[in-house]
């Protein structure tokens, strides 16, 4: 895999993915959320790439079963196929990091918003329990309390897709610009940043310890009684890590692999790739689940692959899911 200097890569909208080097750094944007709280974004150039897995579902399952002693079935990866060409026709801004607790706190203070875990007929969220038998929705958990220590520099968790949409609408109204979740295609394009390997760090899952926070030796040592499929290396964190602690990809984005799953705008469609349009796909017109990408601190290494997909109901919230925002240029 060719290595590119961060900030020196420009993706050209040509047949296949093409690159040329430039001395100009990526264009950044600092959005003022109020009270001195900033949200940094990076401009992604328009371009095209191959979306989905470059290896068969059978090969993916066989690799992880052999390498980590799993018992995974190929069907788990079928929705990553067929791999297909996608063209992102317009530049867009995307958050450099996950939205943090501090940034989300500013939204709540300014708007008075109550999250799905704090209202409704089914309040509460999933939180970390020392006894895995206690795992389940509990009213004591919300974005304010995930069951483990977090500072305002950590990614916010226990936010539903609905909560994230409310954040984007608030910011759009506040700034007079269109803030939103990235589409699934935009997310994978931003994550890959020109790479074609399982991760932007390469094909070896052990390289994740340098670029992201996933289920690892640190988590396994902390929870020896739990059966996690972990990498052998250590990323240094049991739970979530403060944003920006690992190496970014060539576009300048941090934590695209691991830390927290990221909500995307799309409805989930298991067979959508077979009919996906070339230009700016936005997913199925309707559905029951929304897409998440990127894996998490408690997720096995296969979930952190650039092509991996997850789905949850829009009201779901967990200690493993968060988001980053996009803005139309």
Language-model segments: residues:
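Mature N-terminal segment immediately following signal peptide/propeptide cleavage
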Residues: 35-51
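Short aromatic-glycine motifs in intrinsically disordered, low-complexity regions
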Residues: 26-39, 227-233
